[in-house]
Design a protein with these regions (language model features):
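Phosphate-binding/catalytic loops
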Residues: 4, 10, 14, 20-22, ...
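Conserved active-site segments centered on acidic
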Residues: 8, 14, 18-101
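Conserved small-residue
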Residues: 45, 85, 110-111, 159
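Short glycine-rich anion-binding loops that position phosphate/pyrophosphate groups of nucleotides
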Residues: 46, 115-118, 137
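Short glycine-/acidic-enriched loop or helix-start segments at secondary-structure transitions
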Residues: 50-52, 78, 104, 120-123, ...
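Hydrophobic/aromatic beta-strand patches that form the interior of the parallel beta-sheet core
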Residues: 67, 109-111, 129-133
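Residues at the C-termini of beta-strands that transition into short coil/loop
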Residues: 70, 114, 134-136
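Mid-chain, well-packed structural core segment of small domains
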Residues: 105, 109-125
Length: 173
């Protein structure tokens, strides 16, 4: 089954979330196929791009399919990113992956979320619209465990406040 298809009223999303939908709230299959695709790109694909992917797949699942990647992936999703998402009620089973995984795929929008990824965004990604929405790296914060976790919570809050309104601007295009 492909991501975004229904099986027994369970929505399978790219973020790995399963959301039980009642029959009245289920959009038509044709509507789901009209969803736009967005790629969130950062360097390590361990925090910011992962959180952006999860937020979009949770909050805008009926309009967008989000994926994320890194130009130099770390190979893991930061535990504080997963903890912040869980606290916010967002289920995410992402994995840190290279942008190379998406070679040959088409996206309606590519969003770089860190300055380094913006500078090194591969040209082979194609002529899709590209925008940059930079967020400070929460993994760079030094301090106590609570201070570090607070940085991830704050970044998630900023992502959730910033990304959905920007994507809504691109829905009609």
């Amino acid at each position: 089954m492909e991501s975004g298809e229904y099986a027994n009223e369970i929505l399978v999303s790219d973020a790995g979330s399963n959301e039980k939908l009642d029959a009245q709230s289920q959009p038509e299959e044709a509507e789901l196929k009209k969803r736009k695709r967005v790629l969130f790109l950062c360097t390590g694909n361990s925090a910011r791009s992962q959180m952006a992917e999860a937020v979009v797949n949770n909050d805008l699942w009926d309009q967008w399919i989000a994926v994320s990647a890194g130009t130099k992936p770390t190979g893991y999703v930061h535990p504080y990113a997963l903890a912040a998402l869980e606290e916010a009620g967002i289920f995410h089973q992402g994995e840190s992956k290279s942008v190379e995984v998406f070679k040959g795929q088409n996206f309606d929008l590519i969003v770089t979320v860190c300055d380094q990824a913006r500078e090194t965004c591969p040209l082979w990604l194609g002529p899709e619209k590209r925008i940059h929405i930079g967020f400070e790296d929460p993994a760079a914060v030094q301090g106590t465990e609570e201070e570090k976790m607070a940085a991830f919570r704050n970044t998630l809050k900023l992502i959730r406040a910033t990304i959905p309104p920007v994507l809504k601007e691109f829905e009609g295009e």
